[in-house]
Amino acid sequence: MITASTSVFGGLILAFIFSLLYKNKKTRIPAEIDRVRTGGFLAHIRAFGCRLGTRVDDIRNGYNKFNKNGKPFVIQDSTFIPQVVIPPQYLGWLKEQPEKALSAETVRLEQLGLRYLVPSSDPEMVHLLTDVVCRYLTRNFQRVQERLYEELHMSTDEIMGLEATEWRQICLHEAMETILRRMISCVLIGLPWCRDEECLKSWTGFLHCMAIAGTILGAVTPWFLRPLLGLLLKPPVGYMRRRSLRYLTPIFTERWKKIEKHEKSSLTTRELPDDFVTWCIQEVRNGAAEVTMLDLLSADPTIGYWEKLVEEATTAFRTDEDWIHAGTVSKLAYTDSAIRESLRRNPFSIRNVTREVIGKDGLTLPSGTRLPQGTWITTALANIHHDARFYSNPTEYQPFRFVARDAFHTEGKEGSEKVLQPSEAILTSTIDERLLTFGYGRRACPGRWFASHILKMLIAYITINYDIQPLTGPPKKVKFADFTVPSPSIKIIVRRKNLAYLRQRER
């Protein structure tokens, strides 16, 4: 029988063990670096016991108090991993550090839980896939553009409807996820698998399972408990992985055989499937769509943001011929700016550009402070995106902030002209020290060009072909640990534009 005294005694033993683990961990951050919370080990205990939202407040307070003055600070959270948040001024220095000094790979293995959920994962495979994306996908937009448009056209019409006489309610999260999943799949695995619902469900189910388990392990669980919790989470992840491989393995096998025939000159290049699987063998999401749509639909409808995007899209895409030319997407400057602004206002995580000091001798910060091996370095992503030093009126939604024009003129509610001053012409896919959604430096997201490309296609197609009722209030969000995403239950009301309008557009 477990008594109160037994529980207290057991708790004291656990606290003692955790304290020993904490003290024996090789990494001890120098005392001269400022702390948001004081108390060492007890600060981590409080972070673990308090609601997870407190880390948002800690990082915001540390950014305002220290980072804005050019000083790094220490953040203590439930993971018990020593982390130093560097100011924006240090990003140039971080970018120049070699991989042997600062590693993004070791952080990725911990943050995604891969070390415990998929211990057989090969780091070389990650480098390989990155190379495939950089060398093939970003250079072959035109070769996949027609397929992208076909999937966009078919999936959007199927989900949002073709009926122009009545409004219908749809779940925004499900709609965006399904459309983007099919567009991405047509490049990843090609036809007919990209339209096979069971195939799509198998690998997206595996990704969802990995995301949930990885978040629990990497963002919440103390580092010394991860091996134990990983043993409990590994079986369901392994099951979903095997389920997805039942579909994907035959696809890779088929491509491998065709490539072998091609290398023996019995198969022409035109006959060779042109998709991501083929590129992988030869070389061997984000919710961005949702937050962009939600920002546009919750903005003041009298300002005319949506109408401007409709005008831009209808000018660029007059016929189906325009859709199958990848270069047409580059004309969507206002759409690109709207996506970038939503990524600025709604970062997926409060931290990014995280690296681990792996050199045996540690690493010296620009301030002269030396960090020991094992320290994590990160940036206050959300706070940088809302810093008035980098953005005028940072809390205000300005979807055309990044358009290369002197000003965007609109009519306010009272009829007076309102002028929104954009910063400068910067594409969504551009890596910039003020916008870190896609990372920074050599380890920035290699698929950002493709992501930006399909997002602009999706928003353009919807604005051209559908009317959507504005939202009545700010959209709900779900927060957990470092992450914030739109509520998956948000509904929008849509209606297909009538044929007369669409025919008039094509003239």
From Swiss-Prot:
Broadest EC class assigned to this enzyme: oxidoreductase
Pathways involved: Secondary metabolite biosynthesis
Membrane topology (UniProt): Multi-pass membrane protein
Keyword line: Glycoprotein, Heme, Iron, Membrane, Metal-binding, Monooxygenase, Oxidoreductase, Transmembrane, Transmembrane helix
Binding site for heme: C445
EC number(s) stated in the UniProt entry for this protein: 1.-.-.-
Domain of life where this protein originates: Eukaryota
A GO-annotated cellular component: membrane
Annotated compartments: Membrane
Disulfide bonds: none
A molecular function (GO) term: monooxygenase activity
An annotated GO BP: secondary metabolic process
Gene3D superfamilies: Cytochrome P450
Glycan-carrying positions: N352
Function: Cytochrome P450 monooxygenase; part of the gene cluster that mediates the biosynthesis of the indole diterpenes nodulisporic acids (NA). Nodulisporic acid A (NAA) and its chemically modified derivatives are of particular significance because of their highly potent insecticidal activity against blood-feeding arthropods and lack of observable adverse effects on mammals, in particular the tremogenicity associated with the paspaline-derived IDTs is not observed.
Protein name according to UniProt: Cytochrome P450 monooxygenase nodZ
